[in-house]
């Protein structure tokens, strides 16, 4: 096989990519080539041994992918990008844009205007359950819907057990001695004995 493009040049100075481009240009648009066939034609033209081609094969394949003048056509077929109009090229990039439309939208983070970018400040606003308006009614309506009597019975039994220990009517606040550590303690109430 002779390539007219390289007439007068030494074959040892040619790169595999240059030869691949020349082979595909000479064959024409409707004659895409499988990668193996392309490598065999390059080997025959450059008159290289199998070991030389195998050593250069990873670099050649990388160059084929990186070089903008080649295009993979699927099923390991290759062609020249110049053969195809931009509208004809249906690459993975187009399908990725379609996938982004189905992706869930990220929620915007709420910003507290009073935090002023203080990194050490603790924001208690978002973790307080009382701030949420998710409570449908009073506290008594929060019992389990399946067995509301179970939780009510537990609360009532707990209250009755506490009343058995110290009934409410026996509690006198006057009998309770306050220590110095108590909040209601004051120096005026202490009587020296």
UniProtKB/Swiss-Prot annotation:
PROSITE patterns xrefs: HTH_HARE
Domain HTH HARE-type positions: 14-83
Pfam families given in the database record: HARE-HTH
Source species, domain of life: Bacteria
GO cellular component: DNA-directed RNA polymerase complex
Region (Disordered): 117-193
GO annotation, biological process: DNA-templated transcription; regulation of DNA-templated transcription
Sorted UniProt keywords: DNA-directed RNA polymerase, Nucleotidyltransferase, Transcription, Transferase
GO molecular function, one term: DNA-directed RNA polymerase activity
Keyword Transferase: yes
Signal peptide: none
Acidic residues bias (residue ranges): 117-134, 142-193
Transmembrane segments: none
Similarity annotation: Belongs to the RpoE family.
Oligomeric form and interacting partners: RNAP is composed of a core of 2 alpha, a beta and a beta' subunits. The core is associated with a delta subunit and one of several sigma factors.
Function, in words: Participates in both the initiation and recycling phases of transcription. In the presence of the delta subunit, RNAP displays an increased specificity of transcription, a decreased affinity for nucleic acids, and an increased efficiency of RNA synthesis because of enhanced recycling.
Protein's name according to its UniProt entry: Probable DNA-directed RNA polymerase subunit delta
Lineage: Bacteria, Bacillati, Bacillota, Bacilli, Lactobacillales
